[in-house]
Amino acid sequence: SAAAQSKSSVYKPWSHGQLKVSKENRYLMNADGTPFFWLGDTGWLLPEKLNRDEAAYYLEHCRQAGFNVVQVQTINGVPAMNFYGQYSMIDGFNFKNIDRKGVYGYWDHMDYIIQKAEQNGIYIAMVCIWGGLVRSGKMNVEEAKAYGRFLGERYKDAPNIIWVIGGDTYADRNTEIWEALANSILAVDENHIMTFHPFGRTSSATHLNNKEWMDMNMFQSGHRRYGQKKGDGDTSVTGLEEDNWRYVEEALSMTPLKPVLDAEPSYEGIPQGLHDPAQPRWRDCDVRRYGYWSVFAGSCGHTYGHNNIMQFLKPGTPGGYGADGIEKPWYKAMQDPGFNQMKYLKNLMLTFPYFERVPDQSVIAGTNGNRYDRAIATRGKDYLLVYNYSGNPMSVDLTKISGAKKKVWWYSPKDGKLSFIGEFDSKITPFTYDG
């Protein structure tokens, strides 16, 4: 049938083996050596807010938009409650009787979501428990061990799982609980990679890079614009808030070297600074910038987010962060430009020899700009890419890659279209975008 045909044509990365770190230690790949470029959508409340039909619709449209990872809050409460009124815990952290005959329980629904994601070629990056719950004392070390064993046993054979410890929390706090959770999962599940989702404007690499259970690093560049401070004790240097490429450079300078990505940049449609609805909203041009900046700086992929999608706003339900489910429910937000433009970044990176790629800012000749005027370059042996957000004139050192003559194109992050500029000698060459 046509339906069966379309399902069979879905690309499933795990058909190339388990997800793992490449031998260069900077990127991800499947076991047979096929490159895996992480392109994530933020679906935090997917397990709690959506029913079966809605979850299937969401995951299918994520696939159509090019996403191959969805980040979820596995539980956002102790207990969490889902669309069907089912709780994630019915006997605390004792999961012995969690599967009840004749009851479509919380974890049955989670199973369904993971299976639907599998059918769409999507990994579920499971933030096991949101960090605020641990900070407020809702899970101790022994409970973390029990929960980790439960998760590991239940999902060790699912091909499309990525474990995420933490959850918008500081990597140097509650460490014994996070360690217990991570190690109890790995005691029963050696099939999946693991990482840590940190607090805003922090990186897991700062405190966890040496941990054996950490296969890759995440940072959360956060939602603030340049110079925007909340007065919450944030120690980040003011004036650099949007420079998410800096987190990549810092992580890739560490030993041991591990892949890294921005797991939470500014969301499309969310107020700048997050909490004040009167502030301007981040737009598609902004979410594109964070993607290209961090990937060209050397990250192994990128996660996108949308204000109305991550909380799955529906008409008649209260929303946070200045979002309105009547004005724009989650399914309408999936039509927004940023959601549908991120695939052009993934397509671009997978076009070229993948594992040889390095960030190289010496490609930019002369003085580079600051803030939005900063160009960022990455290259392989015979190709180079420069992202120039502001479109200012720039000089590019074409000697950095092989060949006496260089063919040059403009590439549009809005639609993935190429425009041929011409062929140039191998030397420092000025370019000015005239589009």
What are these regions (language model features)?
Residues 164-166, 195-198, 218, 261-264, ...:
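Short beta-strand segments
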Residues 7-27, 31-34, 43-45, 405, ...:
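Extracytoplasmic
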Residues 11-228, 233-243:
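Active-site mouth of glycoside hydrolases
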Residues 1-7:
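Bacterial Sec-dependent N-terminal signal peptides
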Residues 34, 256-260, 267-271, 283-422, ...:
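Aromatic- and carboxylate-lined catalytic core of secreted/periplasmic carbohydrate-active enzymes
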Residues 124-125, 142-151, 279-281, 318-332:
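Short, electropositive alpha-helical surface patch
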